Amino acid sequence: MLLEVMFMKKYLVFLMAALMLVALAVAGCGGSKDEAKAQPEKVLRVATEPTFAPFEFQKEGSEELAGFDMDLIRAIGKKLGCKVEIANMGFDALIPALNTGNIDVAIAGMSITDERKQAVGMSDPYYTSGLIVMVKKDNNDIKSIDDLAGKRIAAQIGTTGADKANSVKDAKVTLFNTNTESAMELTNGGVDAVINDSPVIGYYLAQGGSEVAKTVGDVMEAEQYGIAVKKDNTKLLEDINKALAELKKDGEYDKIYKTWFGEVKK
């Protein structure tokens, strides 16, 4: 009888330890401390708008998403011990999806602005960009944004490029869901210019767009990209900032940067 009692005590101790390990394993990556207990597995639900090469784009003939942002968020997920699941959605749908809890993270070349910081939590900056004007290659009349007054301008909805276009006097601004559509409208003659982020337009030109288009003027309004989370998810924001700092310290960030942009900016 004594042996049976001792065996049962050892069994109960082992069972409690196993249950504690299971409880730790099922804590989710994206939630707060309370929300984490309800997560079935360690998954970081990420969303992006995949027409913003070289930051995020869909590989030709594949459903796989590639780009600087995609490599970066996967590296952050690895630091956090999370499985990263990435969904596609329109750029203007990203912040609403965060606020409704449908996703944990949005990364899509998203500029850190005061307006966005009112709506969501923004990480420390991970890339510095700026805006540039693109016109057709044979257009010699438009030399800078100062020449766009009264012209037809294309931009991507919900972006700082759209804000800049709307600030041009008497301009007729057409907003598109994707950067690809904006560039196509320029090629087809539907607009006189496109305003978008400099690295995105630069990548488009490098991939063959230079045969039909060119940039004019200087890079405008240096802006920094950040990773967005739900406003009250401070724990996840802290974890992302910590992971980002570690990636910069251990050289992994520089490795990813060099893959997509060549020489590393110091």
Task: Place the predicted regions along the sequence by residue.
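Ligand-binding clefts/hinges and TM-proximal coupling segments of bilobed small-molecule sensing domains
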Residues: 31-34, 160-176, 212-219, 242-266
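Short helices/loops that flank or line small-molecule/ion binding pockets
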Residues: 78-79, 87-88, 92-105, 119-121, ...
